[in-house]
C-alpha cells in the first residue's frame, strides 16, 4: 500500500493543507479524519457537491458516475470517491466548475 501527499487548497475558504492519504482511502474520508471540513452530499460519486479541480497529480475516481469524460479531462474530481494514485494538489470547494 502506498501513501501519497495530497494538498487541498482554496484561497476563498482560507484552506491550504497537505495531508497523507493511503491509496485505498477516499480523499474526502482522509480529509475528514485530518479535521478538515470539505463540502459533500451523497458520498457516492453521484452529485457535484464535493467537486474539486485536480491541479497536479493523478487520482482514481472510477467509482463515480456523475462526471462525463470532458469534465474529467478538465480536471474535475469528486473527492468522495477519489483515491490518490500519486502526490497531488486539488483546489476544493469547486462545485461551480461543473458546467
From Swiss-Prot:
Belongs to the 2Fe2S plant-type ferredoxin family. GO terms for biological process: electron transport chain. One of its GO terms (molecular function) is metal ion binding. Binds 1 [2Fe-2S] cluster. It comes from Desmonostoc muscorum. Keywords: 2Fe-2S, Electron transport, Iron, Iron-sulfur, Metal-binding, Transport. Coiled coil: none annotated. Disulfide bonds: none annotated. This is Ferredoxin-2. Its cofactor is [2Fe-2S] cluster. It comes from the Bacteria. The keyword Iron applies. [2Fe-2S] cluster binds at residues 42, 47, 50, 80. Residues 4-96 form the 2Fe-2S ferredoxin-type domain. It holds the Pfam family Fer2. The keyword Kinase does not apply. Ferredoxins are iron-sulfur proteins that transfer electrons in a wide variety of metabolic reactions.
Amino acid at each position: 500500500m502506498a501513501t501519497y501527499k495530497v494538498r487541498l487548497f482554496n484561497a476563498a475558504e482560507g484552506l491550504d493543507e497537505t495531508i497523507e492519504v493511503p491509496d485505498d482511502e477516499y480523499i474526502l474520508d482522509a480529509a475528514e479524519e485530518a479535521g478538515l471540513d470539505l463540502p459533500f452530499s451523497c458520498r457516492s460519486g453521484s452529485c457535484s457537491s464535493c467537486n474539486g479541480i485536480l491541479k497536479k497529480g493523478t487520482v482514481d475516481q472510477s467509482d463515480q458516475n456523475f462526471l462525463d469524460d470532458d469534465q474529467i479531462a478538465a480536471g474535475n474530481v469528486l473527492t468522495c470517491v477519489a483515491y490518490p494514485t500519486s502526490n497531488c494538489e486539488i483546489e476544493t470547494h469547486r462545485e461551480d466548475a461543473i458546467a
